Amino acid sequence: MAAQMREPKVVVLGGGSWGTTVASICARRGPTLQWVRSRETADDINENHRNSRYLGNDVVLSDTLRATTDFCEAANTADVVVMGVPSHGFRGVLTELARELRPWVPVVSLVKGLEQGTNMRMSQIVEEVLPGHPAGILAGPNIAREVAEGYAAAAVLAMPDQHLATRLSGLFRTRRFRVYTTDDVVGAEMAGALKNVFAIAVGMGYSLGIGENTRALVIARALREMTKLGVAMGGSPDTFPGLAGLGDLIVTCTSQRSRNRHVGEQLGAGKPIDEIIASMNQVAEGVKAASVIMEFANEFGLTMPIAREVDAVINHGSTVEQAYRGLIAEVPGHEVHGSGF
């Protein structure tokens, strides 16, 4: 009986800013192990209670958080797995995990992106590689550095099984980090992937010096595009005005710490996308998601002008100026049911 009552051990896979922040939160609630590739990062976490590479020297992590570079140790001891690796490495880590992980261990993704080539959401990859393991996503307006510094924030844990979601939500909840639950995994994952593309669009606008009214226009119409595609793919319309949708869209479009907004600004400064990506310390998921989103839009017969223009700049040689001229040239129709910008 005592063994059944013990605190579940959370294993966070990934050493980036958000994975480390979530690992530190979980460590304040119970036993937590973080797997990282870099020995230097592991030593920094274990000895200095910091992840200086991704969170700087000022953010102090929970002193009960332990890091390891031993993947087998992490996989073999996990009661709950939290996936903090980028979308391009997600499947590979899961495949390695499948060799070691016990049955039924829940897998919670932190990734707000889609897999290029298959266009799959992260929970779909979990279901394919780790059948029988409950899969979900923790999503919301969460700039990692702010959460790590203790500013109040919130997220939503999306899982099909609400009893399990409620139980797991307590692992992530603190006095200043609120965690809600939902069963709309599709909506939460699509909102997380889409907002990155739209943040690039807003970043382009910053580089052009657009006004606040124009910025609000782009964000509002982006929410409409996000909702149209998300609902077409099976998401609930109630998800998109919430934390995973509008909340995350606002912070990713407006925060100076937003990687995707930064990409848009750099594109507006005339830098090639490859040069921008090479100069960044972390992944901007919107760069990879833009073409995938347009494939979905074409599949469902949807017109998505903002996503279209971002894809054109990133993948088809268009300029930021041409993108915004293209949006303004759109003829406005019905605000809800119209197909244009």
UniProtKB/Swiss-Prot annotation:
Molecular function (Gene Ontology), one example: glycerol-3-phosphate dehydrogenase [NAD(P)+] activity
Localization of this protein: Cytoplasm
Pfam families: NAD_Gly3P_dh_C (PF07479), NAD_Gly3P_dh_N (PF01210)
Ligand binding (NADPH): S17, W18, R37, K112, A144, R259, V283, E285
Protein task: Catalyzes the reduction of the glycolytic intermediate dihydroxyacetone phosphate (DHAP) to sn-glycerol 3-phosphate (G3P), the key precursor for phospholipid synthesis.
Pathway: Membrane lipid metabolism; glycerophospholipid metabolism
Reaction catalysis annotation: sn-glycerol 3-phosphate + NAD(+) = dihydroxyacetone phosphate + NADH + H(+); sn-glycerol 3-phosphate + NADP(+) = dihydroxyacetone phosphate + NADPH + H(+)
A GO cellular-component term linked to this record: cytosol
Active site: K195
EC number(s) recorded for this UniProt protein: 1.1.1.94
Keywords: Cytoplasm, Lipid biosynthesis, Lipid metabolism, NAD, NADP, Nucleotide-binding, Oxidoreductase, Phospholipid biosynthesis, Phospholipid metabolism
Domain of life: Bacteria
Family per record: Belongs to the NAD-dependent glycerol-3-phosphate dehydrogenase family.
NCBIfam families, alphabetized: PRK00094.1-2 (NF000940), PRK00094.1-4 (NF000942), PRK12439.1 (NF009098)
Entry protein name: Glycerol-3-phosphate dehydrogenase [NAD(P)+]
Amino acids binding sn-glycerol 3-phosphate: K112, G140, K195, D248, S258, R259, N260
Any single GO BP term: carbohydrate metabolic process
SUPFAM superfamilies: 6-phosphogluconate dehydrogenase C-terminal domain-like, NAD(P)-binding Rossmann-fold domains
